[in-house]
Amino acid sequence: MPVEWLLIPFAYLLGSVSSAVIVSRTLGLPDPRQEGSKNPGATNVLRLGGKRAAILTLLGDASKGLIPLLIAKSMAVSPPLFAAIGFAAFVGHLYPVFFQFKGGKGVATALGVLLGFAWPVGLMALLTWIGVAALFRFSSLSALAAAVLAPVYVWLWLGSAELVVATLFMSMLLVYRHKGNIERLLKGEEARLGAKRL
């Protein structure tokens, strides 16, 4: 097996590391899997521990998607393998082997993957999130909007079928992981950014 193929399991294992759990334990915060929304992600950590903890979680989760792709770029892997490596990191965050396959929703890790595909694509997705969040104050709605538009951004900027397909699958999984949020949005019960979830 060519050594570059080992980047797929490496990306998955790195994705399986929970930044939210590590940051929360380090800072003496409640376990985000047990408190708040019970999602080990930056938004829940923001509610439980404030901005510093949330930023550290966001950077950690995004790095999980970015680092394997930076390594892959340095090895000049093929486009299909490059796409698979990014997708593996994302899946690792959603279904982590270290946490009984119960992970987060994948927003920050998906951002890291998109930045790894091409930084302008990641930037466009991030600006989409920021714009929707500024208008509506819902983290989940912002993530859903960015997820829907991400494959379009990849196609327009890169034109790579492999990367578009990988991004489509990431987007579908991300929307699926937000099904509870979608239900609450439709009922008018979703917590806004800055609100404490009881």
Swiss-Prot record:
Its main location: membrane. It is a multi-pass membrane protein. It catalyses: an acyl phosphate + sn-glycerol 3-phosphate = a 1-acyl-sn-glycero-3-phosphate + phosphate. Keywords: Cell inner membrane, Cell membrane, Lipid biosynthesis, Lipid metabolism, Membrane, Phospholipid biosynthesis, Phospholipid metabolism, Transferase, Transmembrane, Transmembrane helix. It comes from the Bacteria. Its EC number is 2.3.1.275. It is found in: Cell inner membrane. SMART domains: G3P_acyltransf. GO terms for molecular function: acyl-phosphate glycerol-3-phosphate acyltransferase activity. Belongs to the PlsY family. Catalyzes the transfer of an acyl group from acyl-phosphate (acyl-PO(4)) to glycerol-3-phosphate (G3P) to form lysophosphatidic acid (LPA). This enzyme utilizes acyl-phosphate as fatty acyl donor, but not acyl-CoA or acyl-ACP. Probably interacts with PlsX. This is Glycerol-3-phosphate acyltransferase. It comes from Methylococcus capsulatus (strain ATCC 33009 / NCIMB 11132 / Bath). The gene is plsY.
